[in-house]
Amino acid sequence: PRRRRQASRPVRRRRRTRRSTAERRRRRVVRRRR
């Protein structure tokens, strides 16, 4: 179970990074549209 917990931790970090990029792109579009 120790290896599975470690693998789940990095996976969450990678997903957060992808969400950060999508949130930044959406914020730019809202600024450009406004």
Swiss-Prot record:
Region (Disordered) location: 1-34
Major subcellular site: nucleus
Subcellular location as annotated: Nucleus; Chromosome
GO biological process: cell differentiation; chromosome condensation; spermatogenesis
Lineage, highest ranks first: Eukaryota, Metazoa, Chordata, Craniata, Vertebrata
Biological source species: Dicentrarchus labrax (European seabass)
Function: Protamines substitute for histones in the chromatin of sperm during the haploid phase of spermatogenesis. They compact sperm DNA into a highly condensed, stable and inactive complex.
Distribution of this protein across tissues and organs: Testis.
Keywords: Chromosome, Developmental protein, Differentiation, DNA condensation, DNA-binding, Nucleosome core, Nucleus, Spermatogenesis
GO cellular component: a single term: nucleosome
Protein name: Protamine
Gene Ontology MF term list: DNA binding
